[in-house]
Amino acid sequence: MFRCLMQNHQRRALVLFSGGQDSTTCLAWALERYAHVETLGFDYGQRHRVELDARQVVLRELRANFPDWAQRLGDDHLLDLGILAQVGDTAMTSDREIEMQANGLPNTFVPGRNLLFLTLAAALGYRRQLDVLVGGMCETDFSGYPDCRDDTIKSQQVTLGLGLGTRVTIETPLMWLDKAQTWELADRLGGQALVDMVIEHSHTCYLGERGQRHDWGYGCGHCPACALRKNGWERWVAGAAYAD
């Protein structure tokens, strides 16, 4: 175990960081493990563009409140992927009502989004000697997106390693956690300070709502992303109260 931790602390990571709850928790997770961590965000014409602002606030707050992590936190990168809005006409990139489609997926699914994100992250990591990619994909509390599945991520890890001719590791610390466990992980990593940061500064709501404040953070309260975050918060709080 000790040897594994030492090896991790010598590695360099790139976190896919949107500014949401999951990626904020993943960033904290990476900062606990790796010697140097950089962040990567994407502007793909998302309706909830407020998350791009949230990214900068979260990074600022992390640096201010967690000095040990601040020493390991490196450059932030933002890539323009407006083409996703052109090829994937979805409720994530256009003003449409969120609803289920005939294929069983919600129309918030942006085809190929995570596949493209990871490919570009690997290319950037190759140039900057960052051999670990960290993403917030999960198979538990999610909307059924096929590019969030564990087998998809493992397959892409192999493909990227072959295509780049080097070792590529994709870490998904939330893959088998539900939202209640994600709140618990944030608490375990950074205590109440990190939980408060997630509540106040991260952004999840698909509709970009920042005017309504709830116990679990800001959002419309009824889109799929808000529902998952809210339900996870309530289950975590109830579990913590029961444990006490």
From Swiss-Prot:
EC number: 6.3.4.20
Pfam families the UniProt entry points to: QueC
Reactions catalysed, as given in the entry: 7-carboxy-7-deazaguanine + NH4(+) + ATP = 7-cyano-7-deazaguanine + ADP + phosphate + H2O + H(+)
Cofactor note: Binds 1 zinc ion per subunit.
Keyword tRNA processing carried by entry: no
Pathway: Purine metabolism; 7-cyano-7-deazaguanine biosynthesis
Binding residue positions for ATP: F17, S18, G19, G20, Q21, D22, S23, T24, T25, C26, L27
Keyword Metal-binding: yes
Residues the record lists as binding Zn(2+): C205, C220, C223, C226
GO molecular function: ATP binding; ligase activity, forming carbon-nitrogen bonds; zinc ion binding
Top-level taxon in the UniProt lineage: Bacteria
GO biological process, one term: queuosine biosynthetic process
Entry keywords, A to Z: ATP-binding, Ligase, Metal-binding, Nucleotide-binding, Queuosine biosynthesis, Zinc
Function: Catalyzes the ATP-dependent conversion of 7-carboxy-7-deazaguanine (CDG) to 7-cyano-7-deazaguanine (preQ(0)).
Family label: Belongs to the QueC family.
Protein name: 7-cyano-7-deazaguanine synthase
